[in-house]
């Protein structure tokens, strides 16, 4: 429902950015606290969001999921 109403009841007390979901605020707060709970097991880099860790892991696996639309290169 909040998508359509524009309601954002969860506000960051540091920068006053507002969010529709409490877990979005919790993830955002890591930017202010410096918490990086997701660590790469290969090189020890740390990330705020698990999606960023998953994208980073491609560096180690060599995975290149996106191909060029004009040639066969990835």
Swiss-Prot record:
GO-annotated molecular function: DNA binding; zinc ion binding
Principal cellular location given in the protein's record: nucleus
InterPro entries, per the entry: Zinc_finger, Znf_C2H2_sf, Znf_C2H2_type
Domain of life assignment: Eukaryota
Keywords, comma-separated and alphabetical: Developmental protein, DNA-binding, Gap protein, Metal-binding, Nucleus, Repeat, Zinc, Zinc-finger
Localization annotation: Nucleus
One Gene Ontology CC term in the entry: nucleus
Zinc finger (C2H2-type): 1-4, 10-32, 38-60, 66-74
One Pfam entry name: zf-C2H2
Role, per record: Krueppel is a gap class segmentation protein.
Family (UniProt): Belongs to the krueppel C2H2-type zinc-finger protein family.
Name recorded for this polypeptide: Protein krueppel
Source organism: Tribolium castaneum
Gene for this chain: Kr
């Amino acid at each position: 429902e909040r998508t359509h109403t524009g309601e954002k009841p969860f506000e960051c007390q540091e920068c006053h950015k507002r969010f529709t979901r409490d877990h979005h605020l919790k993830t955002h707060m890591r930017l202010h606290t410096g918490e990086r709970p997701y660590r790469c097991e290969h090189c020890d880099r740390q990330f705020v969001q698990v999606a960023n860790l998953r994208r980073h892991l491609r560096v180690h696996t060599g995975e290149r999921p996106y191909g060029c639309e004009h040639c066969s290169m990835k």
